[in-house]
């Protein structure tokens, strides 16, 4: 994964682990996380310090809903999301399919106070 600034310069890149699923019925789901996330010291899913919760939230993205495909874009119609502001949104992704790899790129989005575009390469797993 890499993110680029408004001027096209690289902002950040790094490995992410996750799944992107598209069903033949028109539903999609995506969950991915940065590598090396720290476990909560307490081991309690509702526990954790404020800092642990912030780090956990900032290192994970998840949403699901319906999808629509056009010639060069796929639109995710978000129904559930870790980030509540995305619920009900229609988010467009530019796509490129090559062999067993799908590259999705976002238009500019507000991330950490900056306008960034994200580019993720997904690899097909066993059919």
Task: Describe each region flagged by the PLM.
Residues 1-63, 69-127:
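Lipid interaction determinants
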């Amino acid at each position: 994964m890499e993110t680029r600034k408004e001027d096209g310069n690289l902002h950040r890149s790094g490995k992410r682990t996750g799944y992107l699923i598209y069903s033949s019925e028109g539903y999609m789901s995506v969950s991915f996380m940065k590598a090396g996330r720290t476990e909560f010291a307490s081991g309690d899913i509702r526990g954790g310090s404020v800092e642990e919760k912030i780090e956990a939230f900032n290192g994970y993205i998840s949403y699901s809903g319906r999808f629509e495909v056009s010639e060069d874009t796929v639109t995710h119609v978000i129904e559930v999301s870790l980030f509540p502001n995305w619920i009900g949104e229609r988010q467009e992704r530019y796509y490129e399919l090559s062999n067993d790899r799908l590259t999705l790129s976002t238009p500019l989005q507000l991330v950490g106070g900056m306008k960034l575009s994200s580019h993720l390469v997904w690899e097909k797993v066993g059919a």
